């Protein structure tokens, strides 16, 4: 099953997340099909905290991809800000 979820990056105590489309059987930070955005929870000042390619996300959802709980909240926030 294809899912849209967060893959963690960054350093220890300084998380940075990629929003990726992946097979649900793959590891959290493992192989993915497509990168559709990022989320920086500790962004400060002028730094961009969230960027999502909503067109590609809607494309994958249309093909039957499931969305993780946290990513669904991020999508809702991105649509509200746009």
Curated annotation (Swiss-Prot):
<dbReference type="InterPro" id="IPR000307">
    <property type="entry name" value="Ribosomal_bS16"/>
</dbReference>
<keyword id="KW-0687">Ribonucleoprotein</keyword>
<dbReference type="InterPro" id="IPR023803">
    <property type="entry name" value="Ribosomal_bS16_dom_sf"/>
</dbReference>
<dbReference type="GO" id="GO:0003735">
    <property type="term" value="F:structural constituent of ribosome"/>
</dbReference>
<keyword id="KW-0689">Ribosomal protein</keyword>
<comment type="similarity">
    <text>Belongs to the bacterial ribosomal protein bS16 family.</text>
</comment>
<dbReference type="InterPro" id="IPR020592">
    <property type="entry name" value="Ribosomal_bS16_CS"/>
</dbReference>
<dbReference type="GO" id="GO:0005737">
    <property type="term" value="C:cytoplasm"/>
</dbReference>
<dbReference type="GO" id="GO:0015935">
    <property type="term" value="C:small ribosomal subunit"/>
</dbReference>
<dbReference type="GO" id="GO:0006412">
    <property type="term" value="P:translation"/>
</dbReference>
<protein>
    <recommendedName>
        <fullName>Small ribosomal subunit protein bS16</fullName>
    </recommendedName>
</protein>
<dbReference type="Pfam" id="PF00886">
    <property type="entry name" value="Ribosomal_S16"/>
</dbReference>
